[in-house]
Structures are given as structure tokens and as C-alpha cells.
Amino acid sequence: MKRLALCALLVLSLGFGLLIAQTASGDIVRLDPALDAIVSPNAKLEIIQGDQAQQPSNFFYFGALEGPVWVQEGQNGYLLFCDIPANVVYKWTPDGKVSVFLEKSGFRGTDASNAGMQANNGRLEVIYLGASGLTLDPQGRLVLAGLGGREVTRVEKDGSRTVLADRYEGKRLGGPNDLVVKSDGAVYFTDMTAGMRGRDTSPFRELPFNGVYMVKDGNLRLLEKDPLGIVPNGIVLAPDEKYLYVGGSRKILRYDVQSDGTLANGRVFVDMSTETVPGGPDGMKVDQKGNIYSTGPGGVWIISPEGKHLGTIRTPEGGVTNFAFGDADAKAIYFTLRRNLARIRMNIPGVRPATRQS
């Protein structure tokens, strides 16, 4: 009997191993055959810059990375990304060079004693003073979610900064976290309390809620207050701009975008709350077929337009904060992994800022 039980256990173990081999291919966990059209079975995630880079020439020590965006200029392109504790935006070029693109990406004042939330970075405690989200407007100008500065700003062609939003009804925002720009120039962004020391209990908090906002032609509108009970974080528009997705608190919400840019019919699109692996919605993007990509438990989730979880791009170093479609063909995803940059090639081009489909 014991031998029979042992044989049965061995068969079950082998069967489980076969199941894992079938569902996990390299850096991809495949939950649906439809994923093969999106990312090839032999696709590999490679660390291209940071303290875990394989090439010594690509070693670079970052603080805490976020909010990448790819900028394509003719045949050449480069990646911009935030280092929040350093309060800078870095520029990475395909030859592996890193340079400072913008100083004081978030907090731009002189007394930072109460600016930016505190966070643990390994054994270090850091202050999130910088921007946490980047995108481009239809004119190709850089737009920043200035978390530590509690403002949304735009970098003009001459290098000056324009404040697009820093107050709602005279009260300071808590800390813009991420943003997306519609083809008509409307900027949608999420706001939370991460721009202040002490966050929700900060004596410098002026708005008693987290929100989703839209700013267009100099007018700021509050679209959703504490949307369906989540703390809003990631945000992205569908390729046809009919839907707006908002992620946070282990849920992804979907809203209908009205003709005036406001939102309606908010509902839970994906619920990750039952997952036992760490991670949740933060960075979010879409590809040209309408698939949604979101950070989540275990890495980056790839979700069909119908809300089905097709698979996960597994990421090292304790998770991924955000990502962006890059390269000239928009078929590479560049990830910010706290202290490293990584890349993987895809089969379907992503939707990039300032190049949205009609």
C-alpha cells in the first residue's frame, strides 16, 4: 500500500511538473494559448542597466525607478525614466549610456522636510521627492506626474516648466502618481497622498480623498473621488480612447469615456485580490490590439480586451514598478525594476504617447 501511495505521489509530482513546464516558458507564465500571438514562447527578459546588469559597462546604481516613456526621434530613440529618491529623470540610449535628462523632476522647492513619502529601499530608508510618472503630449512635450512636488507639469521646448495642475478648488493635491494623455491633449492623472511625509495622516494633507482628474485647456476637473473604494495608481486609455482603465488596491477599473472627456459606468474589470503572490496594479499600458498590460502579482499581467488574464511576464528583483513600449517598431517593453532596467521583445506593437490610434 505504501509503495502504491508512493507511486501515486510520484505520478502526481511528475504531472505537476509537466503542468508547470507547459504553463511557464522562460520568463513567461502562459495561461491561455492566445498569448502566443502576443509574446513568443522563446522571449526572454534581459536586464540592460543597473546593479544586476550582466555587462560591467552597464552597471549603474539607481535609487528607485518608475514611470518610463520611450521617445522616438526619426530613426533614433531613447528611454526616459524617473529615479524618485534622486529627484531626477534619466535618459538611457541603446548604446547603454545613462545621463541626467531633468533635475528636480518632482519637488522643486527649498525645504523638503515634509515632502515625499518615506519608503524602504533594501536596508535604506528613502524619501520619494521626484516624479513617478512620465508621458508625452500630442506635441511631443514631456508631461510629469510630480509626486514629491504634488503637481503635474509640462516641459516646454525651451526647457521651462509649466504647471498644469497643483490644486483642486484651492487645495493642494496629495501627490500625482501616474498619467496618460488623450489625443485631444487632455491629461488624465491619478492623485494619492504619496507626495507628503506621513501620507494619509500628514498634517499637510489638504484634500480628504484620492482622485482621478482630467486637465484640459487649463481647466482641472475631478472625475472620480476614491474610485470604487480603491487608491488610484496606474492609468491608461484604450487604443480607441473609448475606455479609461484605472488600477490600484489590487483591482483594475474600467470607465466609459464620454464625448466631453468625463467618465461613466465605472466597474471592476480585473480583480487580483485573491492572489497570494505580492504585487498589484501600478504601471499600465495597452497594445494596438487593445490588450491591457498591468503590473500585478508575480510580474506584468497581460489581459485581453474582455478582461481575461492571458499570462504574466515574470520579473525579478521583487517586482516591477512600471514599463513602456519602445524601440522604433514599438515592439519592445522596457521595465523599471526598482534599481534596474529590463527589456523583452513582443509580437504586437504597443500604443505609445503622442501616437495614439484614431
Residue spans for each PLM region:
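Sequence-structural signature of mature extracellular/luminal beta-sheet repeat domains
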Residues: Q22-S358
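Short amphipathic alpha-helical "recognition" segments used for binding
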Residues: L6-C7, T262
